[in-house]
Amino acid sequence: MNIYDQLQPVEDRYEELGELLSDPYVVSDTKRFMELSREEANTRETVTAYREYKQVIQNISDAEEMIKDASGDAELEEMAKEELKESKAAKEEYEERLKILLLPKDPNDDKNIILEIRGAAGGDEAALFAGDLLTMYQKYAETQGWRFEVMESSVNGVGGIKEVVAMVSGQSVYSKLKYESGAHRVQRVPVTESQGRVHTSTATVLVMPEVEEVEYEIDQKDLRADIYHASGAGGQNVNKVATAVRMVHIPTGIKVEMQEERTQQKNRDKAMKIIRARVADHFAQIAQDEQDAERKSTVGTGDRSERIRTYNFPQNRVTDHRIGLTLQKLDTILSGKMDEVIDALVMYDQTQKLEALNK
């Protein structure tokens, strides 16, 4: 099947979507309208590139025709040959780009995310490193123009992060941060270490796509919500009115506690966002486990306990174990300049998928 055979139906469907999205019946159906809007957004880049590619093909044809008709006009012939050379080079570039755009798209790529970071093995040092990761993702979000909102956090006595839950909103957030789930290992000399020995600690990161209510509806009878007084440092109650919310999804036992906001309703809304994402993620993981061959990500094993990256402070080195990438830029990466790592992961993923399709 040539590239036209693959891409023309995509363009035809894109034009059909444009008509459907202006249909009053579709507009009045929120769920259907969102599904079609998302489908249109997911194909827009491919269709735009395909239309540009067709123009390049036309340019090649025009240049070849001009060379034939030059009739001894050396200047015109030279100009046409230059145009032909540039257009053929552009054709190759577009074909490579279109092959990647035709790869099966992760339906979650354009979604916002719920980001969870926890200090794991290593006590206080693990919690401090979890705080470093939080700062890294916050700064990276700034460079991307994303909104980063801490929804719930728990700190320890030395200022480290026991657990933090954040919402990251913006363009294509999940597509870039989905590779961050897993165990992140740090090797450094803790501030409390008097002998100068390097210690190894771990923090875990979980990235889940935000799930809208129209996409995944939780039966209210499966939820239990308890209201209690928010507590501050030392455990003292800080609100005279009970505003904190503890929400439990009874079938799975998944629990969320929220007390960051000053009103019960805002805490309930945030808790609902998190529990919806966690429950949807829980069942998605079960479905993937049942289809093990499809479950394993091309970047790593897909196992969330997998050690994905090591941050070695003495050597200013970051190593991503899934793709064998080592960079002597730890300070740069932790300051939020993550593009080199993320771009390498995306490229590796795309290359593996292309190879799989060509087998």
Swiss-Prot record:
InterPro entries: PCRF, Pep_chain_release_fac_I, Pep_chain_release_fac_I_sf, Prokaryotic/Mito_RF, RF-1
Main location, first listed in the record: cytoplasm
N5-methylglutamine: modified positions: 236
One Pfam short name: RF-1
Subcellular location as annotated: Cytoplasm
GO molecular function: translation release factor activity, codon specific
Name under which the protein is recorded: Peptide chain release factor 1
Source species taxonomy: Bacteria, Bacillati, Bacillota, Bacilli, Lactobacillales
Gene name, Swiss-Prot/TrEMBL: prfA
